[in-house]
């Protein structure tokens, strides 16, 4: 996997956004206030990463952790 793909992101101000982000690179997201930068970074990418990490843990360990909602993506 050389890229992180986001398809159809619909979190807060994001309206069916598709993007490909290269892995192991420094990425900068810029835009106007309210354009969805934080929605992309925290509510989509971070939330999905945390969800996948927690799902990889044992059922015993998962019971002690709160899980973020799955992002609204395709």
From Swiss-Prot:
GO MF terms listed in the record are: ATP binding; DNA binding; nuclease activity
The main location class comes to cytoplasm
Q: Name one GO biological process term.
A: DNA repair
- Tell me the InterPro entries matching this sequence: P-loop_NTPase
A GO cellular component annotated for this chain's UniProt record is:
cytoplasm
Q: Binding of ATP: at which residues? A: 31-38
> What does the record give as the function of this protein?
The UvrABC repair system catalyzes the recognition and processing of DNA lesions. UvrA is an ATPase and a DNA-binding protein. A damage recognition complex composed of 2 UvrA and 2 UvrB subunits scans DNA for abnormalities. When the presence of a lesion has been verified by UvrB, the UvrA molecules dissociate.
How does the record describe its quaternary structure?
A: Forms a heterotetramer with UvrB during the search for lesions.
Family, as annotated? Belongs to the ABC transporter superfamily. UvrA family.
Q: What is this protein's name?
A: UvrABC system protein A
Question: Could you tell me which species this protein originates from?
Answer: Serratia marcescens
């Amino acid at each position: 996997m050389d890229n992180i793909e986001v398809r159809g992101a619909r979190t807060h101000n994001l309206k069916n956004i598709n993007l490909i982000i290269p892995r192991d690179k420094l990425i900068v997201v810029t835009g106007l206030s309210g354009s969805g930068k934080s929605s992309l970074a925290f509510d989509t990418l971070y939330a999905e990463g945390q969800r996948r990490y927690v799902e990889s843990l044992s059922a015993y360990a998962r019971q002690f952790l709160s899980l973020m909602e799955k992002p609204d993506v395709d």
